[in-house]
Every structure is written in C-alpha cells, then in structure tokens.
Amino acid sequence: MSINKVHQFEKAIVALLNLDGWNLEHCGNGFEHFDAIGTSPKGKQVVLEIKWRKKYYDKKMIEKYKFDKLLEEDAEALYFVADPKGNYLFWLNDLAKQETVELYCPDTTLWTKKRNNKECYLLDERLAHKLNINIY
C-alpha cells in the first residue's frame, strides 16, 4: 500500500470522527508520532494514532515505543484500530500498566521488507470503546 493510500485512510477516519463531534486535524504527513491532533467531543486535547489491520485479532498490537511517545504528548493519547470486525478506540492514558511482549515485526510497515524484534503491547479489545463507524 502506498503512503498516499495510508494518508487517504487516515483522513477518512478523521473526517468520520469529526462528523461525530470531534475536532481533529490530520497531521500524518510529517514526522509526528501521531496521525491527528485536536479535541474530543467533550473538549479534551487529544493526539490520535490510527492503524488498520486486514486480519482480526482480539488483542490489538501497539509498539511500546509508539505508546510511550503518545503518552509524552501534552494531551490525551488515543489509539484507533480498524479491522474487519470493528473499530476500536483506546484511551491510552486510562489503561493500567500493560505487560510488554517481544514480537518479530516489520521494520517499517510500508517502506521495507526488513523485520526485527520489537517490544509491543497487546491491548485487549475489551479495554477499547467500540465505535460504530463503518469504513469497509
């Protein structure tokens, strides 16, 4: 998948959330550690990382590095995951400390075929708010 397709998908998610009362701006074109920034429907400052998966897993993976970088921001850190069974929104600041696992992952999902071991969290989907927007 090309980087342009990735950005189109991210912008579509942002647009759908904005229709539901969010006020987000896509910023995934640069070197930020998140894909959107803005406010929640209740006016909270937020940063949003967006991922989609072609396969369904009941545990949603996020790299520890990405998780930690999101929490460093002066805003609520959110993680949006879309997969064939639904759309999940994790409020990362509210999650209890998770255990890390080491997984053999792509170095960079879109631009290389290299793989290496990465520390990751596997977030149980029951910890997320399941959203009813349909993007497939």
Residues of each region from the PLM?
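A general structural detector for well-ordered alpha-helical segments in enzyme core domains, enriched
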Residues: 13, 66-69
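Non-catalytic C-terminal interaction segments of nucleic acid-processing enzymes
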Residues: 19, 39-42, 75, 83-136
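Short acidic/glycine-enriched loop/turn segments that link adjacent beta-strands
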Residues: 30-33, 86-87
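Active-site-adjacent loop/helix micro-motif of nuclease/hydrolase catalytic cores
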Residues: 54-67
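Arginine/glycine-rich "motif VI" loop of SF2 helicases in the C-terminal RecA-like domain
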Residues: 70-74
